[in-house]
Amino acid sequence: MNITEFEQHVVEQRAVAAGHYDAEYFTGAWRDAGNNYNLETRRQIEGKNPALIKEVFQPTKVLDLGCGPGALMHLLHELGVDVDGIDFAQSSKELATPEVRDRIAVGYVGDATLKPDAAYDVVVCREVLEHLTVLQVKQTVANMARMTSKYIYVTTRFHPSPASLLDFTTQFDVDPSHITLLNKDMLRLMFVLEGCRSRPDLEAKMDWGHKGRVLVLEKA
């Protein structure tokens, strides 16, 4: 993809509406067995992720950006971690457990008015960016860099075989709202341009499943 093609594709992208992420999206029969968003299913899927977040980052205060119904928030809460969440969908708050429901703010993940600067020592953003347009990804990256005082931990789906830095694709066979799979280097570049530096040592610790979908950045 050259710059002209990139520009055209970016202009043509359309954002997914918040209403798409309703109860059917999170818990409906369309999901593969064992992949819905009820707490006990997510507990099995998360495995050691919550404990690793606490161990690797040793956080005082965590923000789960694009938290969905708050399953990771609940699991971190069980470990004694102080955690807030932001999600685009009202259904996320409605489906959350009582322990974390009131800690979820409903709003756009790129909205710079929802939380103060440097309010969290870790901003977590997992399996969110693929649901955004390229322009929304750029805004959300900037917002993460603004809200963190130290670390950003991201997982997302990346382009499986990009021919250039600018290449991005979709993944509608997995989820109809997977509209942006970037080149991994492009996403890293966006964070670097926001004043963050890569932490490959921490990426190796967090990518215990060896899926190649983890980025860890530290605010410079």
Segments predicted by a language model, with ranges:
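Glycine/Thr-rich phosphate-binding loops of Rossmann-like dinucleotide-binding domains
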Residues: T133, P162
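Short glycine/proline- and charge-enriched loop/turn segments
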Residues: L166-V174
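Conserved helix-to-beta-strand junction in the class I
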Residues: N143-M147
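Short catalytic micro-motifs in class I SAM-dependent methyltransferases
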Residues: R126-H131
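Conserved N-terminal segment of class I S-adenosyl-L-methionine
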Residues: M1-A118, V122-V124, L135-A142, F158, ...
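Short, well-ordered secondary-structure micro-motifs
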Residues: A96, S164-L165
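Conserved beta-strand signature within the Rossmann-like core of class I S-adenosyl-L-methionine
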Residues: T148-F158
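C-terminal lobe and adjacent flexible extensions of AdoMet/dcAdoMet transferase-like proteins
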Residues: E218-A220
